[in-house]
Amino acid sequence: MAAAMAAVIALPAAAQEQDLTVLPPAQNGYQPKTTEWGEPDFRGGWPIDHLNGRTPLQRDPQYGNRIFLTDEEFAERADMVAELAKRYENEDSSGTMGIGHWAEVAAANRRTSWIVSPANGRLPGFTAEGKRLADAMRSTWRRNQPWDWTTDFDSWDRCITRGLPASMFPVMYNNGMRIFQAPGLVAIQMEMVHETRLIPTDGSPPLPRQIDMWLGESRGHWEDGNTLVVETTNFKPGPSITNIGTTGSPPENDTPLSPQAKLVERFTMTGPDSIVYDMTWTDPVVFTAPWSARLDWVRDDEFEIFEYACHEGNEQIRNYINTTRHDRAQARESSQ
């Protein structure tokens, strides 16, 4: 496991010696073992906790088109991450950590952002319709927004879903991923919000476009004996496609989607314990251009996924609504 992790961290270092603006292609010479029914075997635990080392979804403009940090910049980030980890260690050793381990700090990464296209590493601009849809979104993360009913909360607030592609990016906690396979089917279990993606690979036709779902409707196929390609459409409008829990995401959970949204993913196994995850999101109604990101997954079959006990109907939603009603009542009384 340590060797696999070292390979993931070392790869950007090698690229850094060449051109910091170039992302090397995923190595696809590795041929994984096959399942009992002859498909590439991706089964196992693939948590993405190790990606939670302060690399943002979107690149800080100071880095321009650079995909990787310089040695000096990486050392600065590593020091910052080490300081965060030290605070945890101090609390842990003194017995005052409490529930602190619900969030973990990973080792620093040399990447300037998870987004690799556009070249500036940032989400493309909204179209006029995209801006209108974003302005209409509701969430507990939106500033100065009242909460009058459940429609004023997003699907993550209500413990329903983080949606896609947000669910595929690291956050501060619950980063477990596990892949299961059966003949003609791949399932990806996600720890956050206890969801599972079901991806047919048997060539069955997709569902009609009028049937939409929170995680969309996926169809997959195998390429080169080591790559799972997944295309997902039929997304149910509602969730923000980015999530504030991912460092560097828009801060108000207000990145919308339209019925034309499409997600294309490539899971390439580059070694027995490594997968390169590439994704491209296209939604011409919302964005002025497609955007793409890359993450490196590392196998950890010992990672345990426990119950995610957040559920719709818990006290938080009621408390938000009651607080808004209380504030409105106070405002009426003071105006009389």
Region roles according to the model:
Residues 14-336:
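PEST-like low-complexity, intrinsically disordered acidic/proline/serine-rich tracts
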Residues 1-10:
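Bacterial N-terminal signal peptides
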